Each structure stands twice: as structure tokens, then as C-alpha cells.
Amino acid sequence: MNQTIDTNKQRNWAATYDVIVIGFGAAGATAARFAADNGAKVLLTDAAPEGHEGGNTRYAGQVVLTGYDFDKMKHYFKQLFGPIKIDEKMLDTYVHGLTTIPDYFKRYLEIKSPVSYNKVHRDPDFEAFANGLSPEYPEFEGSETVDLTTVHDGYFDASLWKTLRGQVTKRENQIDVWLASPAKHLIQNPETGVVEGVQIQRHDQLVDIKANNGVVMALGGFENNNDDIQNFIGVPKLKVIGTLYNKGDGLKMAQEVGAKLWHMKSFEGFGFNTGFTFENTAEARGKFILSPWPDLSNGSIFVAADDGSRYVREDENGRHGHAFEHGSWKNPTVYSHPHLIFDREQYRQIKSRGKLPYDDFFKITVKANTIEELARKIKANPKTLVQTVERFNVFSENGEDLTLNRSGDTMRAFGDGPYYATPLATAMLNTQGGAKRNEQAQVLDAFDQPIPHLYSAGEFGGINANQYNGGGNLAECLIFGKIAGENAATVKHDIEVTPESTSTTVDLGGNDLSSDQALSNYSVGKDQYLGVSDAGIGGRVIVRVTYRDDQLKNVEVLEESESEDVGQKAMTELPKEMVTQNTYDVDAVSGASSSSRALKSAVRNAIQKATQPAKNSAD
């Protein structure tokens, strides 16, 4: 479908803005707020429905890569890129931004005391994790300058995302937010090459929205598009552990206007061992296993590829899904159906731990009396799997792994059956590929020339390639989001400027995040009270509590947008526990601490109103 303007015919614009930002994650939120701060009226549109906006930022560790010495940090990054060529001006812009992150938090995010990840490891559960990220490549020269900055001393709690989202909502007079409204096409003038607007699917209709000064592409990667995964990365499949809404839409739009693509093969992962999660057909999103799980790499257990042979060193801690290979860190080969293979003794060892980091571990595990039978059940080669077990046993007895160099003291020979196999998947955090940009955040064409009025930021065409240090993507969102927003807002004089307007024949709706809604949509009866919390990963949680004679009679969750997996589990299970125990202060659901905390906060808010009736209100 050709979306270029017919110069002999007037296009019917449904609305006009100064700047349109596509994608409401860290990069899009940043671009929108800085465009607004530079005087622009902004439309921020996202494909995800309310509560699922935020892209991968919602699910990230909330750490932002930071460096204190420009020269050392640049040298460190040169080693990360290795033989991969990177534009010097782009790298200088990025590294300079990294050295300003603490000040950025103070000046622009209103964080009075940003936390240095290196200095504060208060939570022992995260200390090893912290040491593995800052720096992620301690052997590289200049690594001593690497740090991570956080909003507070907490991780994986959407704290940065909620801060960025708040910067958007507080500018609701300047920024309109459209959710569940995917951009479909960029509208480019065929004579001038100027990107003049965006075609958006809004309320089941395609509408053309004009951008007087610029369009920012901040719509993430292609993690959820398996065709793109196979075509660009060249692997059969990857299991997403971030957002489910990054589907590669930006690639089509960018190619449609002649943009150059770069870093298409680069992607980051995270998980146990080198970067695994579990393959469970009941889950659209893979479980992010952050907690240490030594039993999966210690004992009579190994990882088998599709044919039953070993291919990764099980006791190696991956670096964002990268494993050490002949002098550098690479994404390991991705197979269609890898499995953990283990024996009865290992099964008992895992079983003895009680509650596991993954609740469905035994539910998805396959059992067989012999290795040959197990191979057939998992569609591996029986002869190959038998040989793999035999070699593993020899290595275990000799204390030396001659295949993959796993530490001998982590290996125990397989004993008698039964034997077990648990399906695995290579975990995918994010892709890096997309439209190539320059240091001004301008999207470039096939000849490295800027496409007029088109900008980008974030993981859609990210700067990071080859080896990656944690927090680098979020830093890029903040750095290039600011540049893109400011440059897109600059008044241009190469097209006819249209005043802000809306077609009277098209119902576009209003700002989907308008603060005028809140609790006014819900009613209460006798002994009922509304409670609200904005602490959820998906944003606001609203509950209606029935409270009588100091007894918590009922808890109804009226509004929430937590993640489909463990977040929803918290919303379903905790209200029953609260009523049973007559308190909001119940144990959190494993893996859903933020969602649990938000629900408890909302119920506490309602109970406070119940016990202080004079102050009870619905606002």
C-alpha cells in the first residue's frame, strides 16, 4: 500500500500535531516530554492497550548504564563493539550521555538522590546480580568507570518506567496519549521526501494524522515476529521475556520510506545458565528466572540440543545471553527444542528444595525409564543422547569436561532411571535492529542521508551491537529520546504548517491517560470503600473493599493492568487470602512482588477510609 502523498490531491488529515511519537516506552516517553518542553503539541501513540504500554521498559531491571570518565568509557565501548564498526560521532554522543546520567536523573526526572548501583547493594538477593552487570566485562580496560544508576535502591519494580510515565501524564495539556492505536504507515511526500504524518489505526479506523515538525520512531524491536527473527537473526525461534507488543512494525514503516537498517542480527537475552527460560506452551511470555538456581548446573544434569548432544557449558553465567566463544562473548547457537536432561538422583535433589523459582517445573517435565525412551519422547536421537550421557559420565568420573570445559566438581555421573527432560527455550530480552540513526537521532536513508522530519530512539535501531553491558539500552532511550524529541520539535519551514485541527467526521477520542477519570467511574454501597494505588507495574490498581465490624468481608479488584502471568495470579489469589486472614498484609505471590505490593497498598488505602469514615471519599 503506497502511503506517499499525491501532490495533485489534498490529503484529508483527521488531526494535526507538531510532533508524533510512535511507541510509549522509555524512548517514546522521553521524546514526547522533551518535545512538549520545547513548545510542541505532541501525539504519543502505542499499539499496546492501557496497562501494557511501556514496551520492554516495564519488564527491565530499571538500571541505567553510567560512566564517570568519558575517555575510559569510550575505550570500554570500543572493546564491546570489537570488530563491529560504529560511527564515531554516534559513539561520542552516546558515551557523553552516559557520563551525565546522574545529573539527568536530577534535572529531568526529579530524582533528588539517584542511587549508584555500585555503592548500594542492600538486598542480598541482588548483590551477585549487581556485581555481574557493573561492569559486565570487568576484564576490559576502562571498566572501572562503569556504574549503573537507579531511581531508588530497587530493581525489576518498574520504578524508572513509572517515573518516565509520570513525566508524560503531568504534561497532559501538551501530550495526547493514544493506546491500542498502532501506527501502520509513515506518510511521506514523494517529491520532497519529507515525512509529513502517520497513518494510525484508531478505534477500528485508519486515520491520517499530520506532524508539522517531526515524527519519532520509538516503537521497539521485533521480538514477537518470528518471521523477522528467522530472517534477520537466523534462528528458529526465541522465547520473549519482555513485552508482547514489539512486533517489528517499525521495520515495515522504515523500509517503506527508504530507511537503512542496521544491527539486525544483534539481540540480548537473560536467564539461568547462559540465558535460558522454560518452554511452556501455556505461557506467551517466558518466565524471567533471576534467582540463582544451582541445581540446574550442578549434579547429574546437562543441557541437550535437538539431537541430544551437549552444546553449552551449563555452569557458565551468561552475559545477557552471551557465552564465551574463542575469545569473545557470542549468542550461543539457538535450537528448536533443547532440554535439561537429568536422572533420578537429580530429580530428588531438585524436589527437596520445596518451592522452586519456576512453579511449573515438574508439570512440564517428561519422564522415561530409559535414556532411549526419553530421547524418543523429546524427539532427540536415541543413539546420540545415550552417547552424550556416557561421555558425561566419563567426564564426571575423571573430573574433567573435555567437551565444554564445565567444572568437574559440578558434574555427577548419571545413575539408574527413571530419567527426566525439561523443555527449555533461549530467552529473548530485546532485539537491537532497526532504522539506522545519526548523532542527531535522524533516521538515515540507504545512502546515509537524513530522511526529512524522521527521528528515532531506543531499541528500534539501537546503537548497541556485538557485546552488551546491562543498562545500555535504557540509557540509550534516555539519551537519544531527549535528542529526538528536541529536534523533532524544532519548527520546520519546508512544509505548509497546518493549525491543530480535528476532522468533524472522525471520532478520535481523547487522551487515553487523562487523570479526570480515576475513581469517579466506580460506585460504592453500604460498608464499601474504594482504594487506589499507583505502585503496580501496569500503573493504577483500584479495589472496592467491604469492611464491617473490623472485618474484611470482601476485596474486589476493579481496575488493574498487571502482566498476564504472575501479575494476574496476584490479583486473583491475594484478595481471597486477605479476606481469610482479615488483613491486607499477606505474603506476596512469588515472582509478582510489585503487583502484590500494589494490591496490598490499594486495599490498605480502602481500609484506612473505612476506619476513618470522616475522611472517606472517592478521590
Question: Which residues does each PLM region occupy?
Answer:
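Extreme N-terminal leader/targeting segments of oxidoreductases
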Residues: M1-V19, D37, T66, G462-N464, ...
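N-terminal Rossmann-like FAD-binding beta1-loop-alpha1 element of flavoenzymes
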Residues: V19-L44
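Conserved redox-cofactor binding core of oxidoreductases
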Residues: H96-L206, N226-D227, T274, S396-D416
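An anion/pyrophosphate-binding glycine-rich loop and adjacent beta-alpha core
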Residues: L251-M253, K260-A380
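Active-site- and interface-proximal helix/loop "cap" or "latch" segments in soluble metabolic
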Residues: N521-A618
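Glycine-rich FAD pyrophosphate-binding loop
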Residues: D37-T57
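A glycine-rich dinucleotide-binding beta-alpha-beta segment and adjacent secondary-structure elements
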Residues: H185-I187, V194, T384-N464, L530, ...
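Glycine-rich loop(s) and the adjacent beta-strand/alpha-helix scaffold that form part
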Residues: R202-Q205, K210-F278, L474, F480-I483, ...
